[in-house]
């Protein structure tokens, strides 16, 4: 088992006292050099960056309260240098000095596959411990593909595939191109954030608060802002921040539905139940440049095949039975059973009138009509809408894609959201 997964899977082995002592020991063991007047600090070796990942999560650290010596990544200390200097050359042999700088956060072999995050058991305490240390935090993000493990300089004058060095800056860890810095050309930015181009780039929240809120939102649909803050405890957030963060996660899910999971062929089929949901949706989604504080909504109609959890949508609302027929022919196979809320069905008329208008290609029913035919699993999925509808003004929120996501991933919803984020930002 990977050491990071061991920590998350076995939080009972850690106590607050041992965790604090281990973090203090690690903080005192790091070795950084002042590099220039900008307070940059080069990471001088691979072990320097990996010490948190391999040692902080190693149970032996908390048992012995000291780093293991002479094993794994912590070799035996070098023998003391001779003070006489008779056997020490004045100038080292050319090429004997190791390359300085760090071009990856982790070894590429330590970066997990997209599905491995699904095996982790997260809770608020684990996330708080991970992100309480900046170095361990970016190692966690790099391991699960939430930030790039390496960066290539995009400046035209740099050599092709020129890797950037990871350094510790006054504002945190950044990537810096040493070639650009050596040229000292004006108007060239030699440093970029480790979060640039990721979903965290526009965030102004501390990472511990951001991920703990994501976890609470995934596990508790339909809560009010007051209830979410009660779960957050000392990490409580202001109303605007909660609203923007929820909107951001819904945009991520909508983008995943539109670009990855949406069916390219009509869904449903003979005797299969397809649910119709009218919802708002966010326009002009963009992973790389969108500021999540600015949103413009449009109305969509979403079709969900309940048996196999497939989704398809049209970019127009349904005002009458002709619009319904047009949307069904585009998205749903003939012979399907179309279900919707009673209040939504009233827009098109009575059930028999609707079926006749559709030339009996589809059977139209309400949710109440088919409820006795649902098994317990499907009833639990339908109850997700009941929980989400407890939020005031729910009809003014783009919730249909969130409902579909929660249907698909009722278990470990937070883990699946992390996986979806990785898939989207690697495109």
UniProtKB/Swiss-Prot annotation:
Inducers of expression: Induced by exposure to nano-polystyrene particles.
Keyword DNA-binding carried by entry: no
GO biological process, one term: transforming growth factor beta receptor superfamily signaling pathway
Keyword list, A-Z: Nucleus, Transcription, Transcription regulation
Phenotype of the disrupted gene, per the record: RNAi-mediated knockdown causes abnormal male tail development. Abnormal fusion of structures in male-specific genital sensilla (simple sense organs) known as rays. Abnormal fusion of rays 6 and 7 enhanced in a sma-6 mutant background. Reduced fecundity in hermaphrodites. In response to nano-polystyrene, causes decreased locomotion behavior and increased reactive oxygen species (ROS) production. Intestine-specific RNAi-mediated knockdown causes increased ROS production and reduces expression of daf-16 and sod-3.
Subcellular compartments: Nucleus
Region described as Disordered: 68-102
Recorded GO CC terms: nucleus
Gene Ontology MF terms in the entry: DNA-binding transcription factor activity, RNA polymerase II-specific
Taxonomy, superkingdom: Eukaryota
Signal peptide (residue range): none
Key word Zinc present: no
Biological role: Putative transcription factor. Acts in a TGF-beta-like pathway during development of male-specific genital sensilla (simple sense organs), known as rays. Involved in production of reactive oxygen species (ROS), acting downstream of the TGF-beta-like dbl-1 signaling pathway. Involved in locomotory behavior.
Name of the protein this chain belongs to: Male abnormal protein mab-31
Classification of source organism: Eukaryota, Metazoa, Ecdysozoa, Nematoda, Chromadorea
């Amino acid at each position: 088992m990977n050491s990071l997964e061991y920590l998350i899977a076995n939080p009972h082995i850690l106590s607050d006292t041992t965790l604090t002592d281990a973090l203090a020991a690690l903080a005192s063991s790091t070795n950084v050099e002042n590099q220039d007047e900008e307070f940059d600090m080069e990471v001088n070796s691979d072990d320097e960056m990996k010490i948190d990942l391999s040692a902080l999560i190693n149970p032996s650290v908390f048992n012995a309260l000291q780093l293991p010596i002479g094993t794994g990544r912590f070799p035996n200390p070098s023998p003391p240098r001779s003070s006489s200097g008779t056997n020490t050359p004045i100038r080292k042999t050319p090429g004997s000095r190791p390359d300085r700088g760090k071009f990856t956060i982790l070894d590429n072999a330590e970066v997990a596959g997209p599905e491995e995050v699904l095996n982790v058991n997260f809770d608020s305490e684990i996330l708080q411990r991970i992100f309480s240390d900046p170095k361990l935090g970016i190692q966690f993000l790099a391991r699960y593909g939430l930030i790039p493990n390496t960066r290539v300089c995009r400046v035209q004058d740099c050599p092709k595939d020129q890797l950037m060095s990871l350094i510790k800056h006054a504002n945190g860890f950044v990537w810096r191109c040493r070639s650009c810095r050596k040229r000292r050309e004006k108007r060239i930015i030699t440093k970029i954030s480790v979060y640039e181009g990721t979903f965290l780039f526009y965030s102004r929240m501390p990472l511990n608060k951001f991920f703990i809120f994501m976890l609470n939102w995934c596990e508790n649909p339909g809560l009010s802002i007051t209830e979410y803050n009660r779960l957050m405890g000392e990490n409580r957030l202001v109303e605007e921040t909660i609203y923007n963060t929820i909107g951001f996660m819904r945009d991520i899910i909508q983008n995943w539905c539109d670009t990855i999971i949406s069916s390219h062929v009509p869904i449903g089929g003979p005797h299969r139940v397809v649910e119709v949901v009218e919802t708002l949706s966010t326009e002009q989604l963009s992973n790389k440049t969108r500021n999540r504080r600015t949103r413009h909504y449009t109305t969509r109609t979403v079709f969900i095949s309940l048996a196999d959890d497939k989704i398809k949508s049209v970019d127009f609302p349904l005002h009458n039975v002709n619009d319904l027929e047009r949307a069904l022919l585009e998205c749903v196979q003939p012979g399907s059973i179309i279900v919707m809320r009673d209040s939504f069905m009233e827009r098109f008329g009575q059930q028999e009138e609707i079926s006749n208008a559709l030339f009996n290609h589809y059977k139209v029913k309400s949710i109440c009509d088919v409820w006795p035919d649902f098994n317990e699993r499907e009833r639990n999925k339908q109850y997700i809408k009941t929980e989400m509808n407890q939020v005031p003004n729910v009809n003014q929120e783009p919730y249909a894609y969130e409902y579909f996501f929660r249907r698909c991933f009722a278990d470990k919803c937070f883990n699946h959201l992390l996986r979806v984020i990785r898939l989207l930002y690697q495109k």
